[in-house]
Swiss-Prot record:
MF terms (GO), sorted A to Z: adipokinetic hormone receptor binding; neuropeptide hormone activity
Top-rank lineage group of the source organism: Eukaryota
UniProt KW GTP-binding keyword: no
Subcellular location, record wording: Secreted
Cellular component, GO, one term: extracellular space
GO process annotations (BP): carbohydrate homeostasis; G protein-coupled receptor signaling pathway; glucose homeostasis; lipid homeostasis; neuropeptide signaling pathway; positive regulation of glycogen catabolic process; positive regulation of insulin secretion; positive regulation of triglyceride catabolic process
Keyword S-adenosyl-L-methionine: no
Keywords from the UniProt entry: Amidation, Cleavage on pair of basic residues, Hormone, Neuropeptide, Pyrrolidone carboxylic acid, Secreted, Signal
Propeptide: 34-79
PROSITE patterns: AKH
Protein name: Adipokinetic hormone
Biological source species: Drosophila melanogaster (Fruit fly)
One Pfam family this sequence matches: Adipokin_hormo
């Protein structure tokens, strides 16, 4: 693979990553088609009280990763 094609692939991947947005918060009704009212635009609207804020969810994910890393280190020290 020549350097020009590698740069082109990297640029395309970078552009795709810049356009991607992920959902970090999930409500108990995530994935269900019968969410909310039947009016237009209500399918994707968030319901009050079901979702945490982004900061709360990121903190929860961080704590989970931190606890899993600690468990891994504890197992590593036992060996």
């Amino acid at each position: 693979m020549n350097p020009k094609s590698e740069v082109l692939i990297a640029a395309v991947l970078f552009m795709l990553l810049a356009c991607v947005q992920c959902q970090l918060t999930f409500s108990p009704d995530w994935g269900k088609r019968s969410v909310g009212g039947a009016g237009p635009g209500t399918f994707f609207e968030t319901q009050q009280g079901n979702c945490k804020t982004s900061n709360e969810m990121l903190l929860e994910i961080f704590r989970f990763v931190q606890s899993q890393a600690q468990l891994f280190l504890d197992c590593k020290h036992r060996e």
